[in-house]
Amino acid sequence: MATVVIVGSQWGDEGKGKMTDYLSQEANVVVRSQGGDNAGHTIEFDRQKFALRLIPSGIFGENTTAVIGNGVVINPQALLEEIKYLTDRGVDISGLKISSRAQVIMPYHLLLDECQEKAKGAAKIGTTKKGIGPTYVDKVSRIGIRVADLLEKDTFAAKLKQNLEIKNQLFTKIYGVDPVDFDEIFNQYYEYGQQIKQYVTDTSLLVNDAIDRGDKVLFEGAQGTMLDIDEGTYPYVTSSNPTAGGAPTGAGVGPNKIETVVGIAKAYTTRVGEGPFPTELNDEIGDYIRETGHEYGTVTGRPRRVGWFDAVAMRHARRVNGMTYLSLNLLDVLTGLKTIKIARAYELDGQEINYYPASLAELDRCTPLYEEVPGWEEDITQVTDYEDLPANAKHFLDRIVELSETPLATISVGPSREQTIILRDPWRG
């Protein structure tokens, strides 16, 4: 068997789509295992750029099966819009498969997300208001509606009625907004179910059979380690597990089926929304990196917060993911900087620490301890061999490897598939 999990090792937006695009050239199956349409990824294919939110990047591979697994929460309206977006641009989506066990984002989840965020005021966490959190809450509360339920008219009606009895009480008595209408939701979402029915199957069976046959299976992550509900900067996190452990549970396979974990990172750090960010840059250098790296959200368009590479957070990601390799993106963005900094440790209350604190209060008191390395002026966007990189760029990469305690698999020097330096092939170890 050959299985590779791709995880974001920072706060998301690390460029996982490019690595997925590269590895999916050989993959037989590409699986999305968690999250929803709150996370966007951009893929270059056939000289076109595609911004996807739900459908796995493997949809562009010839004879590749693209799976939306049971751990994903699906907004069927967003999914159908994405299907149309792809088919209108000539993409064959016959390889798309959707888990019958995946949870469905309903209109009341979207409204509840908005009401809850507004009620928090200054304590808001910066949700994308896509209904992700409320959908996962219903899943854990065992009242969620799954894709399989959409296809059974009586089951869907009963579950929807039960949910609206609870949700409309919240809307009218707690949040002071109008209730949502049963008939409108039922008719619309039952029709959505009929439209996606042709793609729905037992994806756990499909993926396990593929692995047992010796097919190459790629697990495509969304968000990033530092947004993980357990291992991230809680409560400023997503509602699922973007770490490597979330891949087998969200795809319906055993953990012993996972062979290789590739962590994706930028040569610097970004995050969107609220929450701690020890290496954040609020100066001209931060502005330079943001503009040069086009650091604006794929889904929201929001400017991303920018900071130096954080080796403390990276070691945390290496440990909790069991990372085999690190894939470093956007090295070219740092070109032109005279000096580049890497956070090698933190100082907390006068003591040097090498771990990432769970306490937000402690994180607020942490000061990064930086190692400075010289930058480079040479254009590296056409470099395809590691040895052809400038000496200072290679020194920077050496320090990233040493401080992150993880070997490099690839280095990205531009957005296209060709602008990738391959050091190790994750499929072959």
From Swiss-Prot:
Enzyme class, UniProt record, top EC level? ligase
Q: Which UniProt keywords apply?
A: Cytoplasm, GTP-binding, Ligase, Magnesium, Metal-binding, Nucleotide-binding, Purine biosynthesis
Output the CDD domains linked to this UniProt entry. AdSS (cd03108)
Q: Does the keyword Ligase apply?
A: yes
| Note accompanying the cofactor annotation | Binds 1 Mg(2+) ion per subunit.
Active-site residues from the entry: 13, 41
Question: Which residues of this UniProt protein bind Mg(2+)?
Answer: 13, 40
Q: Where does IMP bind?
A: 13-16, 38-41, 128, 142, 223, 238, 302
Where is it chiefly localized?
cytoplasm
Cofactors named for this entry: Mg(2+)
A GO BP entry is: IMP metabolic process
GO cellular component term of the entry, any: cytoplasm
One GO MF term on file is: magnesium ion binding
- Report the catalytic activity: IMP + L-aspartate + GTP = N(6)-(1,2-dicarboxyethyl)-AMP + GDP + phosphate + 2 H(+)
Q: Where in the cell does this protein reside? A: Cytoplasm
| Pathway the protein acts in | Purine metabolism; AMP biosynthesis via de novo pathway; AMP from IMP: step 1/2
The catalytic activity of this protein is classed by the Enzyme Commission as 6.3.4.4
SMART domains registered for this protein in UniProt: Adenylsucc_synt (SM00788)
Q: Tell me, how does this one assemble?
A: Homodimer.
Task: Give a short account of what the protein does.
Answer: Plays an important role in the de novo pathway of purine nucleotide biosynthesis. Catalyzes the first committed step in the biosynthesis of AMP from IMP.
NCBIfam families linked: PRK01117.1, purA
UniProt cross-references to PANTHER family, sorted A to Z: ADENYLOSUCCINATE SYNTHETASE
The Swiss-Prot or TrEMBL record describes its family as follows:
Belongs to the adenylosuccinate synthetase family.
Tell me what this protein is called. Answer: Adenylosuccinate synthetase
Q: Which organism is it from?
A: Limosilactobacillus fermentum (strain NBRC 3956 / LMG 18251) (Lactobacillus fermentum)
